[in-house]
Every structure is written in C-alpha cells, then in structure tokens.
Design a protein with these regions (language model features):
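Active-site region of the double-stranded beta-helix
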Residues: 1-18, 31-153
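Non-catalytic, conserved peripheral segments adjacent to functional cores
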Residues: 21-23
Length: 153
C-alpha cells in the first residue's frame, strides 16, 4: 500500500524516474487531511508574529505590484486592494501537524527539501508571473486557482 501522497498507480520509483525534475504532476485530492488545518485568521495571526517570515503582495493594477515583508500588524491587513496574497514560509516550525507533511514525501531526499509555505489570497489574488529556481510542491487546500506552467527548456 502506498502511504505517500501519490496515486496508487504511481510508486515513488515511478515518480522519481518520470516526474521529479522532469514534468509537472497534478494530484487532485492528494492530501485531504490538510483541509481545515489553517484558517484565514490563523494565517493572518502567524503573519503578525515577529518570528515568522511572511510576505504580503498587493496588486494595484495589472503591472503594479507592491511587496511587504514581515512582521506585520493588524493595520497592514486593512484596506487591502481587491487582489493580494500573503505567503508564510517555514510553516513546519509553527504547525507540527502540517510539518508532518514531510512524511508524505519521504521518498524525496531531505537535502532537496526546503520548507513548507502557505499562500492565501482572495479570488483573483496572485503573486504574479515568476520562475522558481528550485523544485516546488504546490498544495492547494481549498478554493480555485489558475495555474500556468511554462516549459523552461
């Protein structure tokens, strides 16, 4: 039995051979246990902690973005534009239950893992177009998101 987050037909060996660092893999409902682990108020509270690394991105227009870094206070979340995103890094340090997600990826060498990040945004909120220079597992807990992938080759 596959105890990882992979579909039954994809073993860790198949994932590493055919997908890891080669092509994206969408797994719908891959981690149902994380639903409701963090709600919006908990994310906002974490972002206000001095020890947390967080970013707030405000989109004022199609090509006008503004980046703010933590720590934040409650006033920072008032009068937000329609489109914004908040990101919190190293979530495994603040949520032991979410930190246990690494167990679902035990087949990935530990030296290739960085952190667990949470992103929250209203409808239409985004961090904008960007490239990640490292491997990323994106876990969308709820809501709808439009993901676009570009072949970097």
């Amino acid at each position: 039995m596959n105890t990882y987050c992979l579909p039954p037909e994809i073993t860790p060996e198949i994932f590493l051979r055919d997908y890891w660092q080669k092509k994206p893999l969408l797994i719908r409902n891959g981690l149902p246990e994380i639903i409701d682990e963090l709600d919006a108020s908990e994310i906002m509270n974490l972002a206000q902690s001095e020890d947390v690394t967080a970013r707030l991105i405000k989109q004022h227009s199609e090509d006008n973005w503004e980046l703010f870094t933590s720590p934040f206070d409650l006033d920072d979340f008032e009068n937000l534009p329609d489109r914004w995103s908040i990101l919190i890094q190293n979530l495994e340090q603040w949520s032991p239950s979410l930190g246990s997600l690494w167990n679902k990826f035990g087949f990935i060498p530990q030296w290739q893992r960085d952190d667990i990040m949470v992103s929250m945004a209203p409808d239409g909120g985004s961090v904008g177009k960007h490239y990640d220079e490292y491997d990323v597992f994106l876990v969308q807990a709820y809501g709808h998101r439009r993901w676009q992938l570009v072949d970097s080759a």
